[in-house]
Amino acid sequence: MRFVDTNILLYSISTQTAEAVKAAKAQAVLSNSNLALSVQVLQEFYVQSTRLSRPDPLTHDEALAFIRTWRRFVIQDITLAVLDHALAIKARYQLSYWDSAIIAAAKTANCTEVLSEDMNDGQDYGGVTVVNPFKP
């Protein structure tokens, strides 16, 4: 199973011409069924997609509609066990806490890959490998 980071969701809704190729790739990723997200990813999506300084902000209802659609994927809760695992990952790999929480949620959801533009492509974090789906 593959875990989807927030940036994939944000690119999938982009209407910016400069992001058209990434938007198409992100939409293709999300057309798969064998994906997982976390509550953190959905929260980050909501905050970033409705931010008024964004070139194409969504309304509350629009963002909510996307979030409801993505509930078809496995959604990993953020539990104390995920928090503990994230803190251990942060200490071991020197990642930001938020990236560590993504890796921990992916591992807890039995994912072998995290699809993300924001982390090191190809890096393995204890059995979870980062894959940049936008890399040529």
Regions found by a protein language model. Give the residues of each.
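Acidic, PIN/NYN-like endoribonuclease modules and their adjacent C-terminal/linker elements
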Residues: M1, I103-P136
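Short, well-structured N-terminal submotif of metal-dependent ribonuclease cores
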Residues: M1-L37, L52-D61
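Short amphipathic alpha-helical interaction patches enriched in hydrophobic/aromatic residues
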Residues: L10-S14, S49-S53, R71-V74, K90
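Substrate-recognition element of Asp-dependent hydrolases with the DxDx(T/V) motif
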Residues: A36-Q40, S116
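Short, conserved alpha-helical segments within structured domains
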Residues: V41-L42, E62, V82, I102
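Short acidic, glycine/proline-enriched helix-loop-strand junctions
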Residues: T59, L64-D84, R92, G122-P136
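Active-site neighborhoods of divalent-metal-dependent phosphate/nucleic-acid chemistry enzymes
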Residues: R72-V114
